[in-house]
């Protein structure tokens, strides 16, 4: 998902915390005894209002010794539960349903669990009238809000395929994950309605399972990135907007085909059946739902969604969607990757100079943060409020760590490792050590120190450089000192100077020994330098201060 300002994050946290704080404090780990492999959800969406009626059919594999399946479901009335077609007793608690499962012999036993439920949704499926008074319905599940309308194991570690069977007013369009299988007209009394069936055949986490039901106009790009999707297919892409916004298309979406081409070549095949971009009621700047990205409504009405946001959400189709963080503390594998690959799109589209400017802006954002970066590590195992993970650590610092990792191992090893990481964990889950394994294998380096200092410690290095010109020696003497606020870090630091003749001189300093004091370096210079710069290529996350002695 995308945030563009810290204020947006604070606003979202304030808006949502009341709804999920009680549940965020009690986030259960993955249920090791059960694996939901498929959801089939039939849902009836009303003309107006928030009351739905739905039936969910879950294919559940028992992988351990448990005999009670616990599904997350808030708010709604459960009318009945079946297991393998037979009605069973169940225990309804405020946030869960406990379903006893009959004993079956054998390993990896499969059950078909049916849940009939109804009621007024309060979150997860956002039901509201738009600015023109038209009722719209958009799934908006991150991080664990699917439980407000989908009986599920609402945790990123449990991925499944999903079929949506949505019955809605005939005046509305329905878009969901995956491929459209069919539509047909149905009659409810005298009212004409339409049933839409969508199927996502790749396993995705529940927080990415969504529907859109709204008056939508389609702008079709046709087939893009041909040969670069799974099975060497093309990627059908469309933008869906409110009808009155259709004339503004393609606008900032004009290059979505090129984005998919770039990311496919850098990472691996596009993972889904299509890619839809939708104007929606998501509470985030953008939400990366698998194959159906939802963008905030307001930018469509105020000049267009920023291209950087589109690139960020598109990159999520590989990182976060196809490869999902197994545990929430590793959410940087989603948000940090999307941040950095959006910057790589900038590089491909606008060149190295603009890319460096963007990375410098990302670094400034990190250094200006006073909430998360100075106090918490990127991999934050102590944070219990999931929304608080939407911070500068997960996004900007995570992205900049990838930038430094690329410099550490080199381009070839970096992208080879990214491709193997994606290939091994596509349609599954990963944690940070899975990425480290691939980086070490491709680079032939031990990177434990790198991952520990940048991801498991708060802060960043703070370096002060003082310099003077030695005229008799025709050299510049530079003293480099690390600050003590966050402790000493290990990194190479490039010192660049331009002498009076306009000649550029560079020296790379190993700052490992700076933990014990000051590092001194001498750089030849024919005359007094006109500038002395640290990290001219914007390759290092650090606060850098240069003064002349």
Tell me what each language-model feature is.
Residues 77-84, 175, 447-448, 462-463, ...:
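Beta-strand-rich binding/interaction modules
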Residues 29-31, 116-163, 214-222, 538-549:
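Glycine/proline-rich low-complexity spacer/linker segments in large multi-domain proteins
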Residues 12, 16, 20-53, 132-136, ...:
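N-terminal, polar/Ser/Thr-rich
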Residues 201, 335-404, 408-409, 425-426:
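Acidic/His/Gly-enriched intrinsically disordered linker/tail segments
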Residues 54, 141-142, 152-311, 340-343:
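Hydrophobic helix-coil surface modules that form long, contiguous segments used
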Residues 53-75, 162-169, 433, 483-496:
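Surface-exposed beta-strand/loop patches in extracellular or lumenal glycoproteins
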Residues 349, 391-478, 500:
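Amphipathic alpha-helical substructures
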Residues 68-69, 73-133, 188-191, 197, ...:
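A surface-exposed beta-strand-loop module
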């Amino acid at each position: 998902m995308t945030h563009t300002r810290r204020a947006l994050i604070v606003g979202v946290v304030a808006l949502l915390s009341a709804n999920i704080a009680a549940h965020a404090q009690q986030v259960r780990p993955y249920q090791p005894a059960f694996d939901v492999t498929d959801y089939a959800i039939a849902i009836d969406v009303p003309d107006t209002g928030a009351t739905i009626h739905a039936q969910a059919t879950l294919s559940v594999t028992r992988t351990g010794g448990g005999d009670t399946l616990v599904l997350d479901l808030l708010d709604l009335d459960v009318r009945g539960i079946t297991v393998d077609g037979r009605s069973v007793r169940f225990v309804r608690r405020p946030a869960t349903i406990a379903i006893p499962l009959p004993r079956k012999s054998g390993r990896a036993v499969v059950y078909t669990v049916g849940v009939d439920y109804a009621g007024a949704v309060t979150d997860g499926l956002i039901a509201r009238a738009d600015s023109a008074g038209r009722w719209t319905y958009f799934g908006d599940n991150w991080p664990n809000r699917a439980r407000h309308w989908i009986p599920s194991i609402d945790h990123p570690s449990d991925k499944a395929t999903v079929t949506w069977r949505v019955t809605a007013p005939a005046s509305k369009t329905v878009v969901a994950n995956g491929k459209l299988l069919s539509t047909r007209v149905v009659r409810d009394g005298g009212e004409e309605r339409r049933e839409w069936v969508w199927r996502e055949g790749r396993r995705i986490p529940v927080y990415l399972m969504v529907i859109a039901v709204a008056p939508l106009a389609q702008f079709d790009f046709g087939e893009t990135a041909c040969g670069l999707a799974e099975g060497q297919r093309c990627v059908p892409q469309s933008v869906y907007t409110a009808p009155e916004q259709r004339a503004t298309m393609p606008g900032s979406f004009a290059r979505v085909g090129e984005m998919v081409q770039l990311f496919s070549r850098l990472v691996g095949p596009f993972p889904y059946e299509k890619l839809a971009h939708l104007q929606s009621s998501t509470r985030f700047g953008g939400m990366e739902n698998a194959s159906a990205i939802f963008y905030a409504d307001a930018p469509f009405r105020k000049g267009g969604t920023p291209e950087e946001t589109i690139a960020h959400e598109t990159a999520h189709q590989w990182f976060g969607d196809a490869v999902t963080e197994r545990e929430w503390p590793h959410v940087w594998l989603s948000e940090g990757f999307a941040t950095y690959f959006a910057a790589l799109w900038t590089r491909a589209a606008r060149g190295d100079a603009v890319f460096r400017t963007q990375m410098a802006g990302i670094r400034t954002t990190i250094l200006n943060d006073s909430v998360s970066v100075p106090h918490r590590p990127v991999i934050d195992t102590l944070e219990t409020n999931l929304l608080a993970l939407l911070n500068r650590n997960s996004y900007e610092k995570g992205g900049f760590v990838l930038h430094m990792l690329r410099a550490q191992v080199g381009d070839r090893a970096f992208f080879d490792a990214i491709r193997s990481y994606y290939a091994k964990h596509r349609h599954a889950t990963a944690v940070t050590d899975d990425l480290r394994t691939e980086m070490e294998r491709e680079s032939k380096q031990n990177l434990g120190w790198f991952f520990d200092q940048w991801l498991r410690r708060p802060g960043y290095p703070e370096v002060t450089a003082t310099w003077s010109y030695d005229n008799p020696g025709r050299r510049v003497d530079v003293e480099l000192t690390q600050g003590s606020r966050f402790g000493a870090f290990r990194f190479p630091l490039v010192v660049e100077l331009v002498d009076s003749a306009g000649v550029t001189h560079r020296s790379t300093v190993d700052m490992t020994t700076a933990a014990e004091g000051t590092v001194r370096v001498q750089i030849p210079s024919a005359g007094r330098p006109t500038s002395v710069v640290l990290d001219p290529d914007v390759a290092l996350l650090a606060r850098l201060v240069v003064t002349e002695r």
